[in-house]
Amino acid sequence: MQTFAEIALLREQIRAWRREGRRIAFVPTMGNLHDGHLTLVRKAREHADIVVVSIFVNPMQFEKADDLTNYPRTLENDLAKLNSEGVDLVFTPTPEVMYPQGLERQTFVEVPGLSQMLEGALRPGHFRGVATVVTKLFNMVQPDVACFGEKDYQQLALLRQMTLDMAMDIEIIGVPTVREMDGLAMSSRNGYLTVDERQRAPVLARTMRWVSSQMRGGRTDYSEIIVDANDQLRAAGLQPDESYIRDAVTLQAVSEETQQAVILMSAQLGKARLIDNQVVELTQPAAPVAEAAES
């Protein structure tokens, strides 16, 4: 497994593989890898001869300096895991390599609409940072396919729209959320949970499944469903953040034309912000509006 921190070395190797006619898959990460990330790597291997992984904690997508400083960095362990998975190349740039002129002078990429709505409204600038760094990494790696987790549902939708809008010849593959045995979606931020909080954390997934069951049972009073769901979260000691039921394709409000809806839920538990989602097939005409419930 090769490990490069410099763009020139990365590009030299990519060009060599291209000359050999190799198909390249790419998995961008911020490190602190868990089984969810490794599932992305395995999916990438199914679609290509060469698997490239990046590890870069992107300062452009953090709103709070403390969050950036405290984000877990476990490079040695990450490289060992990726080597065990047979990854061909790991790109580990520094912020100085990725943003040589600093963030203030960096050209940015922003996807209208999807960058500002839902999670984007809660975290201004976050998706601009995601779109910018992924665009730069795509330009460096030039992959045929790129794999992203469905846990970050809005991010996946945004990156699909970005590649379409920018005419990037890259297939974006969404990979189902990997869960712990008790249903908690795997996340690097789960490491922030105390022992007691970890025991309570699966309530988010259970509540989401309850919302899904209500919808599949025919309920269309989505705002009331979300209010009830938030009450369940509070009863378990979680602080509801933003929760929505939206059209699974557009992420706009559910309409009569909606065939698939997505439940998007988030909650604060101690130092960890937990997020999760589930797509639901609608069996009858949808309610016209489904907005966030007040926390």
Curated annotation (Swiss-Prot):
EC class name: ligase
GO MF annotation, one: pantoate-beta-alanine ligase activity
Active site: 37 (proton donor)
CDD domains, A to Z: PanC
Record bears the keyword Transmembrane: no
Keywords: ATP-binding, Cytoplasm, Ligase, Nucleotide-binding, Pantothenate biosynthesis
Protein residues bound to beta-alanine: 61
Gene Ontology cellular component terms for the protein in this record: cytosol
Pathway terms, separated by semicolons: Cofactor biosynthesis; (R)-pantothenate biosynthesis; (R)-pantothenate from (R)-pantoate and beta-alanine: step 1/1
Broad class of the protein's primary localization: cytoplasm
NCBIfam families the record matches: cyt_tran_rel, panC
Subunit structure: Homodimer.
Protein's UniProt name: Pantothenate synthetase
Organism: Photobacterium profundum (strain SS9)
Gene that encodes the chain: panC
